[in-house]
Amino acid sequence: MTYIVGLTGGIGSGKTTIANLFTDLGVPLVDADVVAREVVAKDSPLLSKIVEHFGAQILTEQGELNRAALRERVFNHDEDKLWLNNLLHPAIRERMKQKLAEQTAPYTLFVVPLLIENKLTALCDRILVVDVSPQTQLARSSQRDNNNFEQIQRIMNSQVSQQERLKWADDVINNDSELAQNLPHLQQKVLELHQFYLQQAENKNA
């Protein structure tokens, strides 16, 4: 059975950058964001239930889910948010477990932004946190997504704190520096962790 390394970090931490460095080494990924999009794909049963609940205004002209419109709709409405989470989380969790079970590589990177918040840590053998300061989160996210600071702050407030996330970490990659300056260091750190995880996987399956 594949050894599972959970990769997590707050908004703007650079999880995708780190995940890509692992894939460059041939490590397979199971990405929660990809799974979350798959379960509400166009014409899917779950998307039909969401439209039934919220109305067709949460769809794009192509009939796909408008994630920004849905996010805005539920963010300040706790009942709607609870309804949506109760619908989606079990389906996403089952799909992720299925994908993890299908992996045959020595270890798999399980990329989940809300790994701790959604209580998915039990699916992991080890947890890797990409750590940045709250100031870096705000600066990066506002540049990347053209979100205003208030929206980003709301998202950050809905996630666990930096301190809480670090309590769960078995391994930490600090990603505060600019990528252009920091890339060689990140590549070296990922290579070291890759070799360590291969050894851990071998020990688990011995």
UniProtKB/Swiss-Prot annotation:
Protein name stated in the entry: Dephospho-CoA kinase
Entries under PROSITE patterns matching the protein: DPCK
GO cellular component, one term: cytoplasm
Catalytic activity as recorded in UniProt: 3'-dephospho-CoA + ATP = ADP + CoA + H(+)
Keyword Kinase: yes
Residues annotated to bind ATP: G12, S13, G14, K15, T16, T17
Family, similarity comment: Belongs to the CoaE family.
Highest taxon in the source lineage: Bacteria
Annotated keywords: ATP-binding, Coenzyme A biosynthesis, Cytoplasm, Kinase, Nucleotide-binding, Transferase
One Gene Ontology biological process: coenzyme A biosynthetic process
Localization terms from the record: Cytoplasm
Lineage of source species: Bacteria, Pseudomonadati, Pseudomonadota, Gammaproteobacteria, Pasteurellales
Gene3D superfamilies: P-loop containing nucleotide triphosphate hydrolases
CDD domains: DPCK
NCBIfam families assigned to the protein according to its UniProt record, in alphabetical order: dephospho-CoA kinase
Species, as recorded: Haemophilus influenzae (strain 86-028NP)
